[in-house]
């Protein structure tokens, strides 16, 4: 009888690698939350601290990474894997000063945030992440996190659905023109209300939004014209116009209205100038004298006559036989001689 075959199991009894832990969890059907622990460099030398951590967090669903190695790009994190990322600062915050410079690096946030699941949380062990540190808070917000009561949370953006919008068709006349309505519709007799349509019940827990009433765009209703006379009441019309300070006349200067005057000063000044001009034109109208108001002006000098005793000094020569006829009046003391019936002055 041949000897029975002997099978040797070569798998390790204790394997704490992350790949083995993930495979074991999937084999067991474990769907628990995954946690990432981010530790400062000095915590690697404290074995008791690491042991106490893994006594609290399940090693099969917890990963440990060093912040300095993550900042140097020596390790990478899987995307959308962790439900909780915990920064180890000790419960009393004794390692806070060691962690803060590393969390001020934007490259670390660019690697940590994508590793969070939607709705995942990022916080520190002492609960002071982003509290009183504007640099950490700014970097967390710029990375897309939202500050909450239990640290920073990655928003869970649900899948967006496209909702088609249907607009009501405009009414068109027979000739192809669109009717316009500039007034309110006349009140028509109320039509009997239609019977309400049966409402179909949807699945439990699912809500439906009816946009038919909100988006019922009627072109005729939107074309109503507002009467601008109804915008002001009687009290508004009787209220005095408030004159701006820049329109008030300055000492020693004439009032001048602005180019775009809206307070009424330009119209008031134009009316005053027109009234002043009409008054001046009325006062400077043409003076009309009557016949009794007119008198002949005599420029002759009485008592100073010529040799003919007909013309006075300053008088024109009018006698038909006068040798000086047609000549201007002589000046006082001027001597006139006649030569060949021609006056020699």
Curated annotation (Swiss-Prot):
Q: Identify the residue span(s) of motif Cx2C motif 2.
A: 319-322
Q: Give the CC-aspect GO terms.
A: mitochondrial intermembrane space
Q: Where is this region: Linker?
A: 164-237
The GO annotation for biological process reads: iron-sulfur cluster assembly
Cofactor field: [2Fe-2S] cluster; [4Fe-4S] cluster
Subcellular location(s): the record lists: Cytoplasm; Mitochondrion intermembrane space
Q: Name one GO molecular function term.
A: 2 iron, 2 sulfur cluster binding
Position of motif Cx2C motif 1?
308-311
Q: Which InterPro entries match?
A: Anamorsin, CIAPIN1, Dre2_N
The residues that the entry says bind [2Fe-2S] cluster are 247, 258, 261, 263
Keywords, A to Z, come to: 2Fe-2S, 4Fe-4S, Cytoplasm, Iron, Iron-sulfur, Metal-binding, Mitochondrion
User: Pfam family of this protein, just one?
Assistant: DRE2_N
Q: Where is it predominantly found?
A: cytoplasm
Q: Where is this region: Fe-S binding site B?
A: 308-322
Subunit structure, per the record? Monomer. Interacts with TAH18. Interacts with MIA40.
Official protein name in the record: Fe-S cluster assembly protein DRE2
> Which source organism does the UniProt entry give?
Podospora anserina (strain S / ATCC MYA-4624 / DSM 980 / FGSC 10383)
Task: Provide the taxonomic classification.
Answer: Eukaryota, Fungi, Dikarya, Ascomycota, Pezizomycotina
